[in-house]
From Swiss-Prot:
HAMAP family: Ribosomal_uS9_B (MF_00532_B). It comes from Synechocystis sp. (strain ATCC 27184 / PCC 6803 / Kazusa). NCBIfam families: PRK00132.1. PANTHER family: RIBOSOMAL PROTEIN S9, SMALL RIBOSOMAL SUBUNIT PROTEIN US9M. Transmembrane segments: none annotated. This is Small ribosomal subunit protein uS9. Belongs to the universal ribosomal protein uS9 family. Keywords: Ribonucleoprotein, Ribosomal protein. Residues 118-137 have a biased composition (Basic residues). The keyword Heme does not apply. PROSITE patterns: RIBOSOMAL_S9. GO terms for biological process: translation. The keyword Transcription does not apply.
Amino acid sequence: MQANDSSNKVVYWGTGRRKAAIARVRLVPGQGEVIVNGKPGEIYFNRIANYIQSLKAPLETLGLEGEYNILVNAHGGGLTGQADAVKLGVARALCQLSPENRQPLKAEGYLTRDPRAKERKKYGLHKARKAPQYSKR
């Protein structure tokens, strides 16, 4: 959705989910900074370049890197799940920006929610699929 920020800047937002992580993403015109839960993205994601590069990938696909600040409220899951949730949220926010952005983002797979999640533990097993050791005699 599109909304006006307190300083009359147009804000585009999107929500992303991955595993147990949920990220609410806002795109604000700016210099390309990433702020996650009030911290710079590089510090929040422990300077792991793959995470930062991953969440900026939808912007790079459209040639918009450096034009929007990414403001994120993320919770749940771990860093990998949160980074992928942010990527989906950024892609959805870019669709709010312009309907023409949808086709290239869809072609790259950025608008697809990854449905894989932790499988539940079953009774009689140690984990989801790990069975107790079998003894024939």
